[in-house]
Amino acid sequence: MAKKERKFYLVQEDLLPEAILKTVLAKELLLRGDAATVNEAVEKVDLSRSAFYKYKDGVFPFHQWSPGVTVTLAMVLEHRSGILSKVLGILAAARANILTINQNVPVHGLASVTVTFETAGLEGDLDNITKRIRELDGVREVNPVGHSLV
């Protein structure tokens, strides 16, 4: 069965369900260190743990895609020669300014890789870029895991 392609949407905050908004707040508490545990964070925002875990990996605050914004892609690649090079080629063709590349030691023939890049000068949208990477032979997963102002 083919894996369903992920799509991303921009949605006004006031249109989002309360559980999604509270999930973002709980994640921010954890990132800032204002909550030491998930339990503490969800209690502070009055959210169930099950709702937090349901949404935590799929909702992120959005910042305008503009110069000075970085994006991080987390990937799982097969441990074969040239796969990471092809991924970097797609990013280079899109004029992404790569800041960091981190690759873990392969385990069971798979390596976790994160690539962080600036969006200034980026040609094409992130959905198209991740789709092109996802279609490469040897790429098992591609997920945008964050973006931030630098």
UniProtKB/Swiss-Prot annotation:
List residues of the ACT domain: 72-147
> Mind telling me which Pfam families this protein's record contains?
ACT_4
What is stated as this protein's family in its record?
Answer: Belongs to the UPF0735 family.
* Record protein name field: UPF0735 ACT domain-containing protein PTH_1602
Against PROSITE patterns, the record matches this protein to: ACT (PS51671)
Gene3D superfamilies per UniProt: 3.30.70.260
- Which InterPro entries does this chain map to? ACT-like_dom_sf, ACT_dom, UPF0735_ACT_dom-cont
